[in-house]
């Protein structure tokens, strides 16, 4: 993901385009991003308490800010840059914490690192001052309706100060297994946006431009903090958000409505530039899968770790002692004698989905429909139990492949991935010990160096990789990878994981921007959990459908 980390270049472009910039510098950013922006290796500190003045957490935040903030300070408006404002934390009132000393520490760190622009917090105004300190910060509001009520609350909290809607939600995001979110109609968007402008209040549309959770960087949501594990909802790779500009940069009805309202309420009439053409898109011809690589062969290329019992992926001793952050973890037990009618029990909850194989044969149910998320192999079930086989098998190899489907971004903090709750995994009434554990991370260098591929046969069942070639004769343009014929997995283009797909919906396509493609041959690899299709198709737009 290093190509996406050019912060200084991004800020230079904003300055060149004469834009003002508001920075949400963290350490928690929410944004439905994986773990709210926290790196998973923080979980290895047993005494850490996220989003508090806990010394361990503050130590890590300090180290982070001491690198990040000097970069940002150089781009402040007072230094000739575009940054006019810094948002401190995000919606702290619903964090499950109430440690205002923590907010003071963040402010001090920012001031000590040369930040001089306006510092603000952002919360739902009905929370009052629970997540802010009015004497230190300007409080802004996050909402999408009841505009006058919310802005009046902001005025009451901080009389004599300007009001700002920091997040005016113009749309919403999608969960896997849910319907495509259309809860903000054009009429609702227009009415509430105009109410803000009429008030008058400053306003930032969230999101103005839909985005993409490339790789494994989608977050997850829980609607009930007290019962979060039963209410886990993974967020799609697409963060299209039904925004004025969609994920691929196309204009929507909300864009034209926004333009019209800004022209109406802008007291300074200026000549507006013409609207640029939308980026070109195409539906490339379908490609045929040519090769396949099964899980057993994939794992031969990975250095395993050995453990008496199953452990969370973050606790695996890889990546220079930082553990595994993303992808999948495979728990393997060899030479296992399985009696007839044996049951496998995974104690606690699986985090987040699991496939079970015996001697390379998938024996667990497929996750094809939204209803399947309430069955075996998901985090919604406590002590998942599965009939392994009706017949006895001697000397078997048992594989449990667990997917990290995205960490919850707000409200839950000690959330490890893999199998780690309870006391382990049981075969009938006996715990299974002495595991071989493989971190399956899908790093680019590993993916592009794989060998041992065999010819594609199309009748494979279970987790495997499939490869085809997309040949582009001219300069590449944006496209959408259309995966409705497949079941569940990830798509990798030229070694880069562009995101996840799931036939259950609501979205059946993955946005593939032109810069990730090249003229000539493009390697398209699919890691499919259950059953492949013979082809990968393309569209020139997103496709939504539910199963």
Question: Model-derived features: where do they sit?
Answer:
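Aromatic- and acidic-residue-enriched carbohydrate-binding clefts of CAZyme catalytic domains
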Residues: 1-3, 31-56, 225-242, 247
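An active-site-proximal structural segment forming one wall of the substrate-binding cleft
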Residues: 3-23, 46-83
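Aromatic-lined ligand-binding clefts that engage carbohydrates, nucleic acids, or primary amines
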Residues: 341-360, 398-400, 470-494, 501-502, ...
